[in-house]
Amino acid sequence: MEEVVHYFLEGNMPVAQFREALALHYTNEKELFEQAKRCLNICCGSNNFAKRNDVLFSLLDVAVSISSLELRKELISELYVPVQSLEEAPSEYLVSCCLQLATIYEAEQNFELLCSSLEAVEKHGHFENDLEQLLLLRIRLGDAYLKLGKAEKAILTVRTSIPLAFKVSNDQLLMELQLCNARALDETGQFLEAAKCYYRVLQYKVPGNELIYRENLCSVAQCLLLAIPSPIVLQFLQEISLQPSVREIPFYSLVEKYLKRKFIGKEDGAFLLPFLLPHQVIHMNRLIEDGRHFLETNILFLSEFFEVSSTSILAKHFKLSEEQVDTVVADMVIQERLNASIDQCEGYITFLPEYGKANNLPNYVNKIATVLQHYGS
């Protein structure tokens, strides 16, 4: 095989004949592996860049044909690493090597090396005139970051890619970027933002979206039920209740409880656990242990119906101390998640109007305890 390479580099053999000759000069894959490495050393020393590059591509084709995954991986690595430093190293060749290695690492579930290989593809490639290929690469890289547990890097990759996707006006790519972004935000506990991205995915009219429609609708609902309680979350739940197939969500009974503004508690969190992803289960278990999430949601429910309450009545109903209720309400007001004022001397909480109360129930402090009992049933 080495003689064939020398002969070709000297210009004494056409490319097609050279490639045919390569296939005839080995009897087993191990021998091919060793001969290919020796041929690489020969062509790396050639100053005939055009011929050298032909040899490189031919050797890569030979490497890809090796059936042994381990030998194939090792030979492609051997063909890639030294060529990076060569003068006028062909970018297309380097990209091909990295993509072949990425495929192998993905099959091995070696996500760290998969990410490195895909990063190298972007480094070596020239995508200025092919933004769609760049975006496909970024989507694959974002997915690899998620599998590696680097969700923050996935978010950064996607956010720098979305403006490019708008340039090429490709809804399929935009949808896949939004889905990757949603999963990354979901995994980092940014549940409201994740819900927004999952919801955007539902809006794209692209082939195949109907197949994942219900799954993404479930993801929107899951994230909203895990998000920090706020009027925005409740309004968002109201909006998704208008979506087709919403009643097919396996935990719709809990969504309906929110829609009807029925008090929720730790038992509702426990009910949701079997429908959550592993990282969401961890988060929900924290919410169940703490309990504050459910109290905040119930206070938001009350704020839509009543103008006045008191810390003492709320504390008695929710079996908490007045100090605990006062702290929670104060925090929600400070964080602008509750439009209310607190009279700490008298212990009254005045829920300020936003768009008008949901209905005209009595608004007297001395009647709230009775109403609460009925409301919570």
From Swiss-Prot:
Domain named PCI: residues: 190-356
Main location: cytoplasm
UniProt keyword annotations, A-Z: Cytoplasm, Nucleus, Signalosome
Residue pairs linked by disulfide bridges in the UniProt entry: none
InterPro entries, A to Z: PCI_dom (IPR000717), PSMD12/CSN4 (IPR040134), TPR-like_helical_dom_sf (IPR011990), WH-like_DNA-bd_sf (IPR036388), WH_DNA-bd_sf (IPR036390)
CC per GO annotation: COP9 signalosome; cytoplasm; cytosol; nucleus; proteasome regulatory particle, lid subcomplex
Keyword Signal: no
One Gene Ontology term from the biological process aspect of the record: protein deneddylation
Localization, UniProt: Cytoplasm; Nucleus
Family to which the UniProt record says this protein belongs: Belongs to the CSN4 family.
PANTHER family, per the entry: 26S PROTEASOME NON-ATPASE REGULATORY SUBUNIT 12/COP9 SIGNALOSOME COMPLEX SUBUNIT 4, COP9 SIGNALOSOME COMPLEX SUBUNIT 4
Described function: Component of the COP9 signalosome (CSN) complex that acts as an regulator of the ubiquitin (Ubl) conjugation pathway by mediating the deneddylation of the cullin subunit of SCF-type E3 ubiquitin-protein ligase complexes.
Quaternary structure (record): Component of the COP9 signalosome (CSN) complex composed of at least csn1, csn2, csn4 and csn5 subunits.
Protein name: COP9 signalosome complex subunit 4
